[in-house]
Design a protein with these regions (language model features):
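Positively charged, low-complexity terminal tracts
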Residues: 1-12, 16-86
Length: 86
């Protein structure tokens, strides 16, 4: 489907947390083993690049605090989803 483009909308909290996560995991060997289709890297690199260039918070001196606040808000929205079952 050449010429078709998809738009994905994220909240600023989602974008910040996803950007941080991608930055931490994309270059780890374990993650490379999970991505078993080289073509998927095209989308991952596009998403990561767009997040990095579109998030001014990354360069803010209070980045760590903003990231932690975003994580806290998103986890609160999730409720019990994704929690380990005892």
């Amino acid at each position: 489907m050449e010429g078709f483009a998809m738009k994905i909308e994220l909240t600023s909290d989602q974008a910040l947390v996803l950007s941080d996560w991608l930055h931490r995991v994309m270059h780890k060997e374990d993650f490379s083993n999970v991505v078993d289709d080289r073509a998927v890297w095209s989308a991952l690199l596009r998403i990561s690049g767009n997040l990095e260039t579109g998030l001014p918070q990354i360069f803010d001196s209070a980045y760590s605090e903003q990231l932690e606040a975003a994580r806290t808000r998103l986890i609160a929205e999730l409720g019990d989803f994704g929690q380990a079952i005892p």
